Amino acid sequence: MAKHGKRYQESRKKVDREKLYSPADALELVKDIASANFDETVDLAVKLGVDPKHADQNVRGAVVLPKGTGKEVKVIVFAKGEKAKEAEEAGADVVGADDLAEKIKGGWLDFDVAIATPDMMSVVGKLGRILGPKGLMPNPKVGTVTFELEKAVKDAKAGKIEYRVDKNGNIHLPIGKVSFPVDDLMENFKTIIDVLLRERPASAKGRYMRSVTVSSTMGPGIKVDPNQAIDLIRK
């Protein structure tokens, strides 16, 4: 077990580990106990009642957070001709084709999102071993393999994030920074809960949203009442 520092231990004392907090109270507490000397990310962890070994229960997709992530997102685009121009005008940081692929093969990975037009996938596919393990491979399921580059680039810049359930049924997502007002964190929180509820697989049995936890980068987890999280959407 890793030992936590003094700040973490002090923060942990302020959290009732037996209590299920309301979403608003949990987010207030995350902000209150954040003590690092940088703007910590606020993370949301949701455990779903799914078995990812079954393809139809592999919950996956992408969502645009209405208040953004608070992070500057570097976007690269694989495209040629008019589509390359469209990507540049939409605000992509780097646009290229074979030259960009060679740059990545050489070890350059200074970006957060990679987007490609479908006709470029013969080039991008060869980067699978590099981009795949880092979660950077363009994928049509999350809208990063597309001819609609203006929308894809602007969504990525605005705070579009991908999610995918892990082998234990957990999904981890950033919902902003501790510097965000609670109302902004709540709006992002609600958006993700809403998306996950809509994505419930028809074959999932029993309770779907089993646990919800929020935390800051350096802080302890704060348990949220899943029923209250769901009620935010059903009101």
Curated annotation (Swiss-Prot):
Q: Specify the domain of life of the species encoding this protein.
A: Bacteria
Keyword Repressor tagged: yes
Q: Which InterPro entries match?
A: Ribosom_uL1_bac-type, Ribosomal_uL1, Ribosomal_uL1-like, Ribosomal_uL1/biogenesis, Ribosomal_uL1_3-a/b-sand, Ribosomal_uL1_CS
GO CC annotations on file: large ribosomal subunit
As for family, the record states: Belongs to the universal ribosomal protein uL1 family.
Purpose of the protein: Binds directly to 23S rRNA. The L1 stalk is quite mobile in the ribosome, and is involved in E site tRNA release. Protein L1 is also a translational repressor protein, it controls the translation of the L11 operon by binding to its mRNA.
Which PANTHER family does its entry note? 54S RIBOSOMAL PROTEIN L1, MITOCHONDRIAL, LARGE RIBOSOMAL SUBUNIT PROTEIN UL1M
Quaternary structure annotation from Swiss-Prot or TrEMBL: Part of the 50S ribosomal subunit.
Q: What is this protein called?
A: Large ribosomal subunit protein uL1
> Source taxonomy lineage?
Bacteria, Bacillati, Bacillota, Clostridia, Halanaerobiales
Give the gene symbol: rplA
